[in-house]
Swiss-Prot record:
Region spans: Disordered: 1-56
PANTHER family for the chain: 50S RIBOSOMAL PROTEIN L15, LARGE RIBOSOMAL SUBUNIT PROTEIN UL15M
Gly residues composition-biased segments: 23-35
InterPro entries: Ribosomal_uL15, Ribosomal_uL15/eL18, Ribosomal_uL15/eL18_sf, Ribosomal_uL15_bac-type, Ribosomal_uL15_CS
NCBIfam families: rplO_bact
Record's keyword terms, sorted: Ribonucleoprotein, Ribosomal protein, RNA-binding, rRNA-binding
Gene that produces this protein: rplO
Protein species of origin: Lactobacillus delbrueckii subsp. bulgaricus (strain ATCC 11842 / DSM 20081 / BCRC 10696 / JCM 1002 / NBRC 13953 / NCIMB 11778 / NCTC 12712 / WDCM 00102 / Lb 14)
Record protein name field: Large ribosomal subunit protein uL15
A molecular function (GO) term: rRNA binding
Coiled-coil region(s): none
Amino acid sequence: MKLNELHPSEGSRHARKRVGRGTSSGFGKTSGRGQKGQHARSGGNTRLGFEGGQMPLFRTMPKRGFKNINRKEYAIVNLADLNKFEEGSVVDFEALKAKGLVKKQLSGVKVLGNGDLNVKLTVKVNKVSEAAKSAIEAAGGTVEVI
């Protein structure tokens, strides 16, 4: 194989569609836009969801729910993740971020009880589930809700 023998795979490249270049091209005169009408005009097109004047589907459905502007979102950390820390260390947001367990400060950090904890830790977080709290204390650690 030589550099001058390189070529793209069959069917991977498409010729540009040149419209309005004579009737024998297949896209002359009306350039594939049909005869007259909204879609034949320049800039003439319907908005997203428009159904020709019929009541659109999204307007036939009832409104539901709302976005709570006071919503709090917590970064989730499971017990199994806390095994990455050394015995007796303090686990807070900075420590979790340094280990790559949380990426950004949301409304805080919540520890959930998924997995097993094998090390004694001091955990300082915003929220903790009952299962996680009992597991941390069973391992000899302490939980401080800040």
